């Protein structure tokens, strides 16, 4: 399977899941994007189309901490950071959107860290 076909298949999976998952103000959607080198996460209110909180492995707060770490540890730090930012905005519950990626590896590490930091999903 070529890279293009894999990307298209992931987008098809994501669209299929997005038909069922919608974020609201009370329970926004936590969307994950995983690239080859980095991981990004946003907490989104789909009713207004606004991003309430975001974090990534290239975030300024994590700049010194992620250097030299493996990708799994980076994902854990990003999960903790986004959970802390969401909690400061008063968000306690989210709907997890894995973005068409398998729930394993870095995606699972990010989700577990966010749960441990206090987000409920």
Residue ranges and their predicted role:
Residues 2-121:
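Ribosome large-subunit tunnel/peptidyl-transferase-proximal elements
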């Amino acid at each position: 399977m070529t890279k293009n076909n894999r990307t298209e298949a992931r987008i098809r999976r994501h669209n299929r899941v997005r038909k069922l998952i919608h974020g609201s103000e009370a329970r926004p959607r936590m969307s994950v994007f995983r690239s080859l080198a980095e991981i990004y996460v946003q907490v989104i209110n789909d009713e207004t189309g606004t991003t309430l909180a975001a974090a990534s492995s290239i975030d300024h707060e994590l700049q010194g901490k992620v250097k030299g770490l493996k990708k799994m540890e980076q994902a854990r730090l990003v999960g903790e950071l986004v959970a802390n930012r969401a909690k400061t905005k008063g968000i306690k519950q989210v709907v997890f959107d894995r973005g068409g990626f398998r729930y394993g590896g870095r995606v699972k590490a990010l989700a577990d860290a966010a749960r441990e930091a206090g987000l409920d999903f």
